[in-house]
Amino acid sequence: MTSFPASHGFGPRKRGYQMDLTNVQPVENKPAWISMKSPLEKEIANEYEALKVTERKEDTQDYNEPELHNSNDPTVDLYADTYATQAATESDSELEDALFSQLDEFDDTAYREQRLEMLKKEFARVEAAKEKGHMQFLTVENEREVMDFTLSSKKVVIHFYHPDFIRCKIIDSHLEKIAKVHWETKFIRIEAANAPFLVVKLGLKVLPAVLCYVNSQLVDKIIGFADLGNKDDFETSLLEFRLLKSSAIDRLKEESSSNKSIYHDELQNNQSDDSDFFE
């Protein structure tokens, strides 16, 4: 009876001078015949994938955003701007009363009632958006949250940052201002070190990196400051206009003194090329 070497039992098998690593290679590197499944295995795999999709839909139901649309209503825009700047000192009801009082100037009763009803609906949408985390710049801790927000929100702007990079802090300051006046978009950020899978999948090698998603589709990437004048003291309106071109936001706000550069004096001594490479 022929005896076989012990090496033919377990582990890699010898083929001449070449080791057969079929059983220890990643799935994507295995020969096609290794990946072939029986009909029963395929059925089980399909059922498992369907179950995962169902579970994911159930998990993301809590993240569903209200349907927000651009009303092109200057009064509603005024409400959002006023809320962003005065919410800390005045209640929502006081702000609404002040805006509703502006409608008293119209003599046309039918027009006034129509506008009043429209404003109430828009205010309800703004309040619903606030409850879902809009009008603020959220920090998330893991990749699952990023993907959930991307799938459940109509418009999402994501900043991949490093806590020690000065230019990441500059982008944070601009996005925080923009988020307060654009309730139709969700603004989030995540430390790049906490998102290794997304960093590799998206090919991010330079920080800061701002990614814009509309209807779960990537529509724009802003890497470093090359598209923002390649200088640290750019104005907030420049980034806002870039987001508008990408359809990540619906409209531009009126430029005011508070909408100009937020680049602080204490950062002016750090003028080195700080588009930071992320390893």
Curated annotation (Swiss-Prot):
Pfam families linked: Thioredoxin
Subcellular locations according to the entry: Cytoplasm; Nucleus
Annotated GO CC locations: cytoplasm; cytosol; nucleus
Phosphoserine, modified sites: S272, S275
Thioredoxin domain boundaries: 137-248
Compositional bias annotation for Basic and acidic residues: 56-70, 254-267
Matches recorded under Gene3D superfamilies: Glutaredoxin (3.40.30.10)
Gene Ontology terms: biological process: negative regulation of signal transduction; protein folding; response to pheromone
Keyword Nucleus: yes
The entry's keywords: Chaperone, Cytoplasm, Nucleus, Pheromone response, Phosphoprotein, Signal transduction inhibitor
Region (Disordered): 56-75, 254-279
PANTHER family: THIOREDOXIN DOMAIN-CONTAINING PROTEIN 9 (PTHR21148)
Job description of the protein: Inhibits early G-protein signaling events following pheromone stimulation. May help create heterodimerizable beta-tubulin by facilitating the efficient transfer of nascent beta-tubulin polypeptides to the folding apparatus.
Family the entry assigns: Belongs to the phosducin family.
Descriptive protein name: Thioredoxin domain-containing protein plp1
Gene for this chain: plp1
